[in-house]
Amino acid sequence: MQGESLLPESAETEIGKRIINVIAGKRRLLIVNGGQSGVDRAALDSALKLMLPCRGWCPDQRWAEDGAIASHYPLTPCGSPTPAVRTELNAYDSDATLVLTRGAPTDGTNLTSDRALAHGRPVLILDLDEQPNVVQFWEWIRAHDVRILNVGGPRESFAPGVVYTRSRKILDLLLDPTR
């Protein structure tokens, strides 16, 4: 048993791919957001699935529209119950912001873009109803030397059953460091 891995072969293969990509210079992003239902939660779940680091500021009491944000998400209360404060902090603490939306951005999604731009951070807006171009996404990441990516967009209540599901599929595709 000595010298043998305790990991299942599938895990070893996945870990091996990630090591090769790190050696090859592929970038591993740190994902940041406030943990709201919808796009934020999809980004955190994608990061956790893909073993990418994630963090962010959330409102006090870990408030989200669907109740308290689960403790397994590594978020820090921002000292205010106001979602705009966490939006500001997450925009400031990142190198760039990716916004996923359906059609034209609305209220909180606009605030995310506005705050990022106010802090001189580039913003990329992708529509949830369109297939993203992975190559163009990574070219944008490299062009702006992004290491910390704020990800935002509408809450789940904007389009129940759609926002999280589509965001998750897109983010699993875009953020996968083995691609």
Residue ranges and their predicted role:
Residues E4-I148, G153-P177:
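Acidic/glycine-enriched connector segments
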